[in-house]
């Protein structure tokens, strides 16, 4: 049990970029994908009512392109994510990249506006 606690502590100290690299390496080693498996839904009879469509509550802000003013975009990415200079620079130069995931709609729109004001092209998914 102490070994598991030590692993948890080590993983908690990883940066976002390090965690993403860990996921890639584990996917390659185990031959799996971290993508969520599609859920199979049994088709009901003709009398069954259609399930109401749920509105998305969590969004992902994706940097599509840094544009001409990379320095301002890097500064904004650092402010949003809390990444160090090198990690933020790598994220911006490696576009398209996920900047922040699991954020509310209002926050995702605010982040999009900030990044676009800095000169970046951004998508909210």
Swiss-Prot record:
Write down the InterPro entries for this protein, in alphabetical order: Ribosomal_bL12, Ribosomal_bL12_C, Ribosomal_bL12_C/ClpS-like, Ribosomal_bL12_oligo, Ribosomal_bL12_oligo_N_sf
Is Ribonucleoprotein one of the keywords?
A: yes
Keywords, ordered alphabetically: Ribonucleoprotein, Ribosomal protein
Domain of life according to the entry: Bacteria
GO MF terms here are:
mRNA binding; structural constituent of ribosome
For the biological process aspect of GO, one term held by this record is:
translation
Q: Which Gene3D superfamilies match?
A: 3.30.1390.10, Single helix bin
User: Listed GO cellular component terms?
Assistant: cytoplasm; ribonucleoprotein complex; ribosome
A UniProt-annotated Pfam family = Ribosomal_L12
Calcium as UniProt keyword: no
Question: Quaternary arrangement and interactors, per the entry?
Answer: Homodimer. Part of the ribosomal stalk of the 50S ribosomal subunit. Forms a multimeric L10(L12)X complex, where L10 forms an elongated spine to which 2 to 4 L12 dimers bind in a sequential fashion. Binds GTP-bound translation factors.
Q: What does this protein do?
A: Forms part of the ribosomal stalk which helps the ribosome interact with GTP-bound translation factors. Is thus essential for accurate translation.
Provide the family line: Belongs to the bacterial ribosomal protein bL12 family.
Instruction: Indicate what this protein is called per its UniProt record.
Output: Large ribosomal subunit protein bL12
Organism per entry: Anaeromyxobacter sp. (strain K)
